[in-house]
Regions:
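Paired acidic/hydrophobic, glycine-rich loop segments that form the ligand-binding mouth/hinge
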Residues: 44-47, 223-228, 243
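Glycine-centered hinge/linker elements that transmit conformational signals in sensory
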Residues: 132-135, 176-206
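Hinge/lid segment of periplasmic solute-binding proteins
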Residues: 48-103, 157-160, 241-245, 310-317, ...
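Extracytoplasmic/periplasmic substrate-recognition and gating elements
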Residues: 10, 115, 181, 192, ...
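Short, solvent-exposed loop/beta-turn-alpha elements that line the ligand-binding surface or hinge
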Residues: 63-79, 121-122, 144-155, 168-189, ...
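Conserved N-terminal structural module of periplasmic/extracytoplasmic solute-binding proteins
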Residues: 1-61, 70-77, 91, 119, ...
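Extracytoplasmic/periplasmic solute-binding protein
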Residues: 89-98, 103, 127-179, 186, ...
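Long, aromatic- and glycine/proline-rich binding clefts that accommodate carbohydrate-like moieties
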Residues: 82, 294-347, 354, 379-380
Length: 383
């Protein structure tokens, strides 16, 4: 990032950008930004997880770019739809998209070859996915077909449920965010498939911490790994012979889920806001984004980046990542952005885990989670 900041400062002599990490991890930023907001010392721009967007917007200290993003120069519609939705909680555009990812199915090519099982097809279905996971499970060799997190992070447990829900025509919440809809027939069918895989086929590694599936995959004990582009450096460093395909389809849809993050602009006066907009408009332009991608291994936040000459160099630097970038076209919907979202996710994630662990039936667990979510959603004041 510092190199990009230096380039911007050199080409924009009337604006000086100072970069700061803000914390040891991105997760550390929210409490620091929240503290700064309370003290009246908010930064001009901060990198904020998309799941925090609604809470940050509630502060009253963010800008609203809604009236300017479609003017010439911003190329707003060149951002992927999920990113556009996440940066606009409640319809208020609080900044610019910063990062996008998605879930796909990563598989161990050597394990498939050894088992004599054809590798997954990009056009596969959930029934085929179940059959492949069952075939690849080998208790004698301690090999599981696929993973699903049941502990450690309820968001991780929940967001793997959303693609199958959307693919079957379901929704997470009502349009007004007052009622949970994830317990629809689409949701029950989706969770029932995973329940059968976990409790009947015994083909699913139920990860109790959401951190054990990765080493299980790199050590050759997990045939298929439902994860995302953040795994690419780890897999290549571990010299795993891997490839990836989109998530299986229901009704012909391979829709996936994405967790976009944002560059949020805080209102520190019109001059500083204008400077922040100029910087982020420049930073998120295709060529600068490609430079960032080369150093970070992140996916393109704009489809137009895939057409740049330097894109092929990015593909060479991060072997295997190309299909994950192509899979962004399947990230069509975003998770809701509202202050109560973390608590809704807790209710849903705990319900899903109870089913996969054999402690509850899909419909009953989803109905209970929906009742809890409805109560949370209708509490005045939100989160």
């Amino acid at each position: 990032m510092q190199g990009l900041v230096n380039s911007f400062n050199a080409s924009h002599p009337h604006i000086v950008v100072q970069a700061s990490s803000g914390g040891t991890s991105t997760g550390d930023l929210l409490p620091k930004v929240t503290t700064a907001l309370a003290a009246g010392t908010a930064p001009d721009v901060a990198y904020i997880y998309g799941s925090y967007a609604a809470n940050i917007a509630q502060s009253g200290k963010t800008v609203n770019l809604k009236n300017i993003i479609h003017t010439p120069g911003y190329n707003w519609n060149d951002f992927y739809p999920a990113s556009q939705q996440i940066v606009a909680p409640g319809g208020k555009v609080i900044g610019f998209p910063a990062l996008i990812d998605n879930l796909s199915v990563i598989y161990n090519k050597k394990l498939f070859a050894a088992a004599g099982v054809p590798v997954p097809s990009p056009n596969w279905t959930w029934d085929q996915f179940r059959a492949v996971a069952k075939k690849m499970t080998n208790p004698a060799k301690h090999i599981y077909g696929v993973n699903y997190p049941t502990g450690g992070d309820t968001l991780d447990t929940s967001w793997r449920f959303f693609p199958g829900l959307w693919q079957r025509g379901g929704q997470i919440l009502s349009p007004d965010h007052k009622k949970a809809l994830f317990n629809s027939p689409a949701g029950v069918a989706n969770l029932t498939l995973w329940q059968q895989m976990a409790t009947v086929d015994h083909s699913v590694y139920l990860d109790p911490t959401a951190e054990k599936a990765e080493p299980l995959f790199t050590s050759g004990h997990l045939a298929m790994f439902v994860s995302g582009p953040w795994e690419v450096p780890v897999l290549n460093q571990a010299k795993v012979d891997w490839a990836d395909v989109p998530l299986p389809a229901a009704d012909g849809s391979h829709q996936t889920v994405s967790g976009p993050d944002n560059w949020v602009i805080f209102n520190n006066g019109s001059a500083r806001v204008a400077a922040a907009i100029t910087f982020l408009e420049w930073l998120t332009a295709p060529q600068q984004e490609l430079t960032w991608m080369m150093g970070s291994g992140s996916l393109p936040i704009r489809p137009s980046i895939l057409k740049l000459p330097g894109y092929k160099e990015w593909l060479k630097k991060y072997p295997g990542i190309g299909p994950m970038a192509q899979n962004l076209v399947n990230a069509k919907e975003a998770m809701p952005t509202l202050p109560q979202w973390p608590r809704v996710v807790d209710a849903l994630g705990n319900g899903i885990a109870s089913v996969l662990l054999g402690r509850a039936a899909p419909a009953a667990a989803l109905n209970q989670a929906a009742q809890q979510a409805d109560t949370i959603l209708n509490v005045p004041g939100g989160g």
